[in-house]
Swiss-Prot record:
Domain of life where this protein originates: Bacteria
Record-listed ATP binding positions: S223, G224, G225, V226, D227, S228, S229
Cellular component per GO, a single term: cytosol
Limits of the GMPS ATP-PPase domain: 196-386
Single GO MF annotation: GMP synthase activity
Catalytic-site annotation from UniProt: C82 (nucleophile), H169, E171
Subunit annotation: Homodimer.
EC number: 6.3.5.2
Gene that this polypeptide is encoded by: guaA
Protein task: Catalyzes the synthesis of GMP from XMP.
Glutamine amidotransferase type-1 domain: residues covered: 5-195
One Pfam family cited in the UniProt record for this chain: GATase
Reactions catalysed, as given in the entry: XMP + L-glutamine + ATP + H2O = GMP + L-glutamate + AMP + diphosphate + 2 H(+)
Official protein name in the record: GMP synthase [glutamine-hydrolyzing]
Length: 511
């Protein structure tokens, strides 16, 4: 079992993943586990500290979430955040009750006592609150470390046990010294060293791949995106002669994607590529299918069928490698009290029984870590910083049924969007940009004639790891040019709208 410096127990907060991200950014390997993980599994990870995340429940409610009480007897430092704070207070018989004044948003705190958490940090800080319950008193052995206007027990702790509790969320960017607080907990309370980096990760993963695969061969599924490209490069660095790289054209690719992928692997990466045209199979199976989850399942099942058929053509192929990320695992499964958001085609979209063993060497890291790993492996910045493209492709960017006419409309609009973003310098400033065909028609006027054509939505977002995102504040003139070109150049589209939703509550992709 892989060891972790810090274990984050998930009680359902939308920010849980950010806790792990902030620690990893500082070289400390953090891993997320469900709140009800067994004490034996925790011990097996040999952590140096534990963090209890926030969550939507109340510790005094009948449906409250509780971790194993033995966590507090392991002799490890523990940090409780929001719900985790209240859980710690509740465990030690302090009073937790509904807050008369709920706090959502920015608040100011003042440090009242020196502690490991606030070492080398200012006494007054701006933090981000998101709670409707409060701690009303402290148990023996605990003392106040910081206060806010509405929270006299905003931060408390027991320095001897190295137990600390925060009412606010240090993991979000709005807490100006939040990252430093988490770093201090890891460094001064848990004695963690900053040794986690992509160089060490690449070396460790290569060793694991060689050990697991032995003399067998691996079928590596690639899409041309950064995730699968990095997987292919990592496998090539570990077992180059045993890797068979396969690209499947599922008919759901962007304009020119197939040609770009074939060129990139052959000329940029120096990796032989088997290219399979399976567009007819995918599109026929997607005919008349409107439900997004069903689309994902069909695509996942079909991919596996094709890969298994290809594997039969090669001797000793026992494994299938995929570019599954930590975010895919989180969004496709129930982690602690968190709910499934959507099934990813390479996680929840897989059939229950497949004839190949899965290798997912990136499943422990986030997207920005994948990019850093790609550079570590020698991939070009052009490859590493391509915008993410979902495995199900354009199928989840078409609302409702997927067919060739709809795909053609979407491809043409998407080409224009990307051309305009690249020509104005906005492509490299944003995380992801694409068009969504809404399959909704509206009335328009072109010349003196009435039109009744499709509407397309532009989605451009800023993010660092894809777990959260905000819409990009593109200049009006850029948006205007994109809209004008799409309406004038793509017959069948007469309306363009811009998606100004953030994640959460929306996801980046529409389906």
């Amino acid at each position: 079992m892989k060891k972790a410096d810090i274990l984050v127990l998930d009680f359902g907060s939308q920010y849980t993943q950010l806790i792990a991200r902030r620690l990893r950014e500082q070289g400390v390997y953090a891993e997320i586990l469900p709140f009800n993980v067994s004490l034996a599994d925790i011990k097996a990870k040999e952590p140096k500290g534990i963090i209890l995340s926030g969550g939507p429940a109340s510790v005094y409610a009948t449906d409250a979430y509780f971790c194993d009480k033995g966590i507090f007897d392991l002799g490890l430092p523990v940090l409780g955040i929001c719900y985790g704070m209240q859980l710690m207070a509740h465990h030690y018989k302090a009073t937790v009750a509904p807050a008369g004044h709920k706090e959502y948003g920015k608040a100011n705190i003042e440090v009242k006592k020196d502690s490991a958490l606030f070492k080398n940090l200012p006494k007054k800080q701006t933090v981000w609150m998101s709670h409707s319950d409060k701690v009303e008193n402290l148990s023996q052995g605990f003392e106040v470390l910081a206060t806010s206007e509405n929270s006299p027990f905003c931060v408390f702790g027991n320095e001897d046990k190295k137990f600390f509790a925060l009412q606010f969320h240090p993991e979000v960017q709005h807490s100006e010294f939040g990252k430093n607080i988490l770093k201090n907990f890891a460094k001064y309370a848990c004695n963690c060293e900053s040794v986690w980096n992509m160089g060490s990760f690449a070396k460790t993963q290569a060793e694991k791949i060689r050990e697991e695969v032995g003399n067998d061969k691996v079928l590596c599924a690639v899409s041309g995106g950064v995730d699968s490209s990095v997987v292919a490069a990592l496998l090539a660095s570990a077992i180059k002669e045993q890797v068979i790289v396969v690209f499947v054209d599922n008919g759901l690719l962007r304009s020119g994607e197939k040609e770009q992928v074939e060129f990139m692997f052959k000329n940029t990466l120096g990796i032989d590529l088997i290219s399979i045209d399976a567009s007819e199979i995918f599109l026929s199976r997607l005919a008349n299918v409107r439900d997004p989850e069903q689309k994902r399942k069909i695509i996942g099942n079909t991919f596996i069928e094709i890969f298994e058929e290809e594997a039969k053509k090669h001797k000793d192929v026992k494994y299938l490698a995929q570019g599954t990320l930590y975010t895919d695992i989180i969004e496709s499964s129930v982690v602690g009290a968190s709910k499934t958001i959507k099934s990813h085609h390479n996680v929840g979209g897989l059939p229950e029984k497949i004839n190949l063993k899965l290798i997912e060497p990136l499943k422990e890291i986030f997207k920005d870590e994948v990019r850093a790993l790609g550079l570590e492996l020698g991939l070009s910045k052009e490859v590493v910083y391509r915008h993410p493209f979902p495995g199900p492709g354009l199928a989840i960017r078409i609302m409702g049924e997927v067919n060739r006419p709809s795909l053609e409309l979407l491809r043409k609009a998407d080409v224009i969007l990307l051309e305009e973003l690249k020509s104005t310098g906005w492509y490299d400033k944003t995380w992801q940009a694409f068009c969504v065909l809404l399959n909704v028609k509206s009335v328009g006027v072109m010349g003196d004639n009435r039109t009744y054509d499709n509407a397309v939505c532009i989605r451009v977002v800023d993010a660092s790891d894809g777990m959260t995102a905000t819409f990009s504040h593109l200049p009006y003139e850029v948006l205007e040019n994109i809209s004008r070109r799409i309406i004038n150049e793509v017959e069948g589209i007469n309306r363009v709208v811009y998606d100004i939703s953030s994640k959460p509550p929306a996801t980046i992709e529409w389906e």
